[in-house]
Amino acid sequence: MMNVLLISTYEMGRQSFGLASPTAWLRETGAVVTCVDVTRQEFPEAFAATADLVAWYLPMHTATRLAVPFIQKVKALNSQAHLCCYGLYATLNTDYLTGLGVKTVLGGEFESDLVSLVAHLNDKKDASLPHTPGTQLSRLDFRVP
């Protein structure tokens, strides 16, 4: 069973489709998913320290910049976690994010790629391996969160 932490840095308390939708997809695979909006909730250090996959939703430039200290924090807490960033600004900042230690960067319709990443990590059992599926543009079916 994969423990997944999804983080939003810029929702400011609004419902985040960028967390809710992938949560529904990932829970269908049996993953244990915890979501956090760090603008309204305390960062879950205990879960981050044991998560297999930690992923940041980056829908805009500000969210990307705000994610940086949390990426560094997770690297310090859990060097074994696979770090991922997804969303419109993730792929625009691929070089910057991978320079910070992010292993997977997803753009476009990211839900199915997150599911593929979890399957890849379950199969490989090596969270340090990069996973680079590219940008998914196909139309995806909506999952009810």
Residue map of PLM features:
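Acidic, low-complexity intrinsically disordered segments
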Residues: 1-145
